[in-house]
UniProtKB/Swiss-Prot annotation:
Its cofactor is Mg(2+). This is Anthranilate phosphoribosyltransferase. It is an enzyme of class 2 (transferase). Belongs to the anthranilate phosphoribosyltransferase family. Binds 2 magnesium ions per monomer. InterPro entries: Anthranilate_Pribosyl_Tfrase, Glycosyl_Trfase_fam3, Glycosyl_Trfase_fam3_N_dom, Glycosyl_Trfase_fam3_N_dom_sf, Nuc_phospho_transferase. Its EC number is 2.4.2.18. Catalyzes the transfer of the phosphoribosyl group of 5-phosphorylribose-1-pyrophosphate (PRPP) to anthranilate to yield N-(5'-phosphoribosyl)-anthranilate (PRA). It comes from the Bacteria. It comes from Rhodopseudomonas palustris (strain ATCC BAA-98 / CGA009). One of its GO terms (molecular function) is magnesium ion binding.
């Protein structure tokens, strides 16, 4: 068993943990072998210094080892944001997920209830009529029969209950805010991940490379959005063929118009569900455009589109043909029958 006191002592000096030390420390926390004081000390020590790629890689290794897995096709994708960007926006990645699924790409989406907005992925899906409190086996059925499934984080990461109270008491962002999107229970190797701060764009791409991902975009909008934004440029770190490259994109690269961040302000789960359904039914406007933009990037990651413009064309067809909305209806039906 790890000597947790020595781990804290090391972090207290400003030293960094090796990947193995981080794996062991997080195993102790998630197994209930560390006290609340010890967990709080380590989490804040890491936060104040700044978590390293090795520390995050080790922590994710533990998260993945303890999660309840879902069976999904090898080419499935996830579209997820860390949340916590404070924007209170509509549910961009959730809407984009249905657009991508409507293009014939399997989506295994991992998410939770709201962090800083009034409506997280789980909240809006429940409001749409999707049953989210289902078993991993039932989620697998959704993925395979509907082409899209939603993995509700608390169901798949039961060991998180050991750190939950400490996280609530700390009431500030910790490494765990980064770990969720990196710990997809379906083990997807193609990911489109939005982060709440630009400082994490490159490091998280490196973490996913360390953990065997094949194709990844990690993004952060210049307006603070944990998605690709319409209001300005978006920083991207792309993992492709084992190499990570960094660049910026703008809506114009996808042939889409810009829109101010306020145009994407969301409401509660019910209001966001109405807005999402309207997009899938063909309503034009900034919400449709931002969903198309994020779907396009995901289609590039999936190898379905060569570039953003082709991705937007495919996404447009997905919505206008009714295919995206059909994926939602199928997910509601399959999850209800689960």
């Amino acid at each position: 068993m790890v000597d947790f006191k020595s781990i804290i002592a090391k972090v207290a000096t400003g030293a960094t943990l090796t990947r193995d030390e981080a794996t062991d420390a997080f195993d102790a926390m998630m197994s209930g072998d560390a006290t609340p004081s010890q967990m709080g000390a380590l989490l804040m020590g890491l936060r104040v210094r700044g978590e390293t790629v090795d520390e995050i890689t080790g922590a994710v290794t533990t998260m993945r080892a303890k999660m309840l897995p879902v069976t999904a096709p090898a080419d499935a994708v996830d579209i997820v944001g860390t949340g916590g960007d404070g924007s209170g926006s509509v549910n961009v990645s959730t809407c984009a997920s249905f657009v991508v699924a409507g293009c014939g790409v399997t989506v295994a989406k991992h998410g939770n209830r709201a962090l800083s907005s009034k409506s997280g992925a789980a909240d809006v899906l429940a409001a749409l009529g999707v049953k989210i409190d289902i078993t991993p086996e039932q989620v697998g059925r959704c993925v395979n029969e509907a082409g899209i499934g939603f993995m509700f984080a608390p169901t798949h990461h039961p060991a998180m209950k050991n750190v939950g109270p400490t996280r609530v008491e700390l009431a500030t962002r910790t490494i765990f805010n980064l770990l969720g999107p990196l710990s997809n229970p379906a083990g997807v190797k193609r990911q489109m991940i939005g982060v709440f701060s630009r400082q994490w764009v490159q490091p998280l791409a490196q973490v996913l490379k360390n953990l065997g991902s094949e194709a990844v975009w990690v993004v952060h909008g210049s307006d603070g959005l944990d998605e690709i934004t319409l209001s300005g440029t978006t920083a991207v770190a792309e993992l492709k063929n084992g190499e990570i490259t960094s660049f910026e994109i703008s809506p114009e690269d996808a042939g889409l118009p810009r829109a101010p961040a306020d145009a994407l302000k969301g409401g509660d789960a019910q209001a966001n569900a109405v807005a999402l359904r309207a997009v899938l039914e063909g309503m034009p406007g900034p919400y449709r455009d931002v969903a198309l933009l994020n779907a396009a990037a995901t289609l590039v990651v999936a190898g379905k589109a060569r570039d953003l413009k082709e991705g937007v064309a495919l996404g447009t067809q997905s919505i206008d043909s009714g295919a995206a909305e059909a994926r939602l209806k199928k997910l509601i039906a399959v999850s209800a029958a689960a």
